[in-house]
Design a protein with these regions (language model features):
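Bacterial N-terminal signal peptides that target proteins for export
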Residues: 1-11
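Bacterial N-terminal signal peptides
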Residues: 9-20
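Bilobed "Venus flytrap"/periplasmic-binding protein-like clamshell domains
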Residues: 29-57, 69, 92, 118-187, ...
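Periplasmic-binding protein-like
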Residues: 33-38, 111-121, 212-247, 265-280
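An extracytoplasmic/periplasmic, membrane-proximal ligand-sensing/linker region
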Residues: 40-41, 47-51, 245-331
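Short helices/loops that flank or line small-molecule/ion binding pockets
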Residues: 73-87, 100, 118, 182-197
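A ligand-binding cleft/hinge motif common to bilobed small-molecule-binding domains
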Residues: 88-101, 164, 190-191, 195-215
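A structural signal for short loop-to-beta-strand junctions that line the ligand-binding cleft
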Residues: 103-115, 145
Length: 331
């Protein structure tokens, strides 16, 4: 009997050693939901992002489920309701994700050329004789294409740097105003469907690499000051282990020498990304300043003293933040 008890104890101990690893092996793989900025058609984005997502799955060990929102607001709301865990955002939509959706910037993109920043553009058909002055006449004779309401280069930048300083409201300036993504606006101008539209240097350069005939059919008549690159944002309440794996993937993907890194960079270049650099919410300070500047200019145009004072206070606070940040980073 004593021997039997010993055998049972040994078997029980062996069972306890084996079962946890078996259960662990059979545990379902965690799914991480990743939203992708709607800069062009979802069909195009899916084909370009699929191999990058496959690499993300391999390196993190998670199942990565992509979410292609039809517009920028869809990405913000998806994160707000915890339908997504992280996403590639524009700066303005990313700012909204931080404000409303519990988001947090952890990396940001950089251009394949290695340079930082891109620019908002105003484009017209190449065959058109339109000048910027003629566009700004606001005689309601032109069909205008603008970006998504939460697009930095498609809406915020042209409003802040071009229209608002002149007291121009697009709805009152043009015959029609159509909101669409950069690719749609680029094609609409190239085909003469639109007389003028916003766009950005990234989308134009990307299209040049894919099919330069489209670029030959458009002409740039205005260029903005440099804009910060796009942020990648995750939910602040994500599991720390998930955050650690995601951070490692983004900060190392496409980096370093060798054929594997070169392959990864080639995949990223198809969506005009050179790689990712560490970042935090201070990355959004320039966009907050742009937003506050537009609000101030609109208040000034309307002549509302209370709104002007409030806008000036907000703008001054943001400028002080930027100055303090510049002081810390220069040390």
């Amino acid at each position: 009997m004593k021997c039997l008890n010993i055998v049972r104890s040994v078997l029980a101990a062996a069972f306890m050693l084996v079962v946890p690893s078996a259960v662990l092996a059979e545990a379902p793989v965690k799914t991480v939901n990743f939203s992708i900025l709607a800069t062009e058609s979802s069909t195009s984005l899916q084909s370009f992002w699929a191999p990058i997502i496959a690499d993300m799955e391999k390196q993190t060990g998670y199942k990565i489920k992509p979410f292609y929102g039809s517009n920028y607001t869809a990405l913000i709301e998806a994160m707000r309701f915890k339908q997504t865990d992280l996403g590639w955002f524009s700066n303005q939509s990313g700012l909204e994700a931080v404000r409303r959706s519990g988001g947090e910037v952890f990396v940001r993109t950089f251009d394949p050329s290695g340079r930082d920043g891109y620019r908002s553009l105003i484009i017209v058909p190449a065959k058109s004789n339109l000048t910027l002055d003629q566009v700004l006449k606001c005689d309601k004779s032109l069909n205008f294409g603008i970006g998504d309401a939460k697009s930095t280069s498609g809406t915020l930048a042209p409003m802040t740097y071009l229209f608002a300083p002149r007291g121009i409201k697009p709805a009152e300036c043009f015959k029609t105003v159509r909101s669409a993504n950069h690719q749609a606006n680029l094609f609409a101008v190239a085909r003469g469907v639109l007389d003028v539209a916003t766009n950005n240097s990234t989308a134009v350069n990307l299209q040049k690499d894919r099919d330069s005939s489209v670029n030959d059919a458009i002409r740039i008549i205005w260029t903005s000051p440099p804009l910060p690159e796009d942020p990648i944002i995750w939910r602040k309440d994500l599991d720390p282990q998930v955050k650690a794996r995601l951070r490692k993937f983004f900060e190392t993907y496409g980096q370093g020498p060798g054929p594997e890194a070169a392959r990864q960079r080639a995949l990223l270049s198809k969506v005009s990304i050179g790689g990712f650099k560490p970042a935090d919410n201070s990355h959004l300070l320039p966009v907050r300043e742009m937003e506050a500047t537009e609000i101030y200019l609109v208040a000034k145009e309307d002549g509302d003293a209370a709104k002007i004072a409030a806008a000036q206070k907000v703008l001054a606070g943001i400028q002080a933040e930027r100055k303090a940040l510049a002081g810390r980073t220069s040390k």
